[in-house]
Each structure stands twice: as C-alpha cells, then as structure tokens.
Amino acid sequence: MPDLAAGVAPAVRISKEQVTEVLEAWGKNSLAGTAFARSLYIRQSLSRSGQDASEAIKAELNRSLQRLSREQRRTTADLFQTGQSVRNVARGMGASESSVYRYRTAAIEQLAEEWTQLEAKAWRNYRSLIEERAQMGSSPLFGVAENLTVLRKALLDTDKAWVIGVDGIGGIGKTSLALAAILDHAILTRFDDVVWVSARQSQWHPVYGIVNATHPALTYASLVSRVLEQLIGAQA
C-alpha cells in the first residue's frame, strides 16, 4: 500500500501509536482522553456537529473501518472492541495467529495514513483561513528571527499576560511578523481558534512623515464586532 501520508509534516502526523491508543480506548469508552481527541480534525468536527469528543471519534472510526478489508475490520473489532485474545480471534476466523497480527498491523497502518491525511487537510484549510482573516499570505521574513523567537515564546508561555503587543509605525512588517508567529503549529494547537483584527492609527507620509489618524482606528465596539464576525463565519 502506498504511503498516503508521505511528505506530511511530523507535527500533524497521526502516529500508529496514537491509532492504537484510540483502538484500545474504543472498548473502554474512554476515547475523549486520547491524543486524537485533541487533533484539529476532531476539534473541528465537534464545532460542526455539536458532538462530544467520544462521539466524533467513534463516528470517524466507524467510517474508517468500513474502508478496511473484511479480515482487517473483523480482527480490529474482535481484538479491541470486544477485547478477545489473538488466539481466540484466530480460532474464530479459522486463521493463524500470525495472520491475525498481520491484519492488525495493516489496519493500524491504514488508519494512521488516513487520519494523517484528514489532519493535514484540516491544518492546510485552517492556515488558509487565518491568512484570509489577516488579509495577507504568509511570506519569508528577513532579519526578524530574534523578534519572532521572542513573540513565539510569549505566546506559548502560559504565565505571560493575556495581551501581547507588537508595536511600531505602519508598514514595518508587524502584521507579517504576527502572522508568522501565529502560523507556528505549536501555537495554533494551544488555542481553539484565532481571529484577526488589524488597525493602523498612524501611517508614513513621504512629505509629512508619520501622520496620526484624526479618529480612533479601532473602537471597542468595532473590535467586538469584527471578532464575532470571524467566529460566526467560521461556524457557518
């Protein structure tokens, strides 16, 4: 079988160990505590369907099992859902124990590949949504490695303040810097969602230099409105 997950970044890969964790939790009704429950794909499924994590994972597991071979599907259900031993499963199928292990391994590998593709697609779509909200695409940055490191560290530090400012005159790349930090996988996984509101209170004029706006570029009411528009739009 070709590796459908080839080329996918390790950060979004659903490993065989994570699949095994899901299958073992399947028969114990403890799916909500698995690593897969924290994946972006499942979190988005919860947002769309209103299901809890266990229901969402069961639904995805049932869909995925239907794409396995009959032997792989039966082996997976008997071993994990009903908790039978390899010996009993082999007897029930009229197969050797080595065949049961082979079906088990192949099933886990296929589930890992399929779920990795689902997770990778979810991340690609989410990154595109964030770039759309920021009204700009991600682009290479030069000479800002130190600033980017500081910003990423601040966003990942749970002891830091709730509000982190990126200050400077208009046009120096603050939005690009913030976008580059936000698109970091470790940062995106920390938050349920990211909304984007940008305001420019001053701008550079070639004759007059820095010119301040005569009215507030962003009010509290407009901030709340723009945040809600993005959150509601994402759930539509």
Regions picked out by a protein language model, each given a short descriptive name:
Residues 1-68, 87, 99, 103-106, ...:
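N-terminal interaction/assembly modules
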Residues 125-236:
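Walker A/P-loop phosphate-binding element recognition
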Residues 58, 69-73, 148:
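Short, leucine-enriched amphipathic alpha-helices that occur as contiguous helical runs
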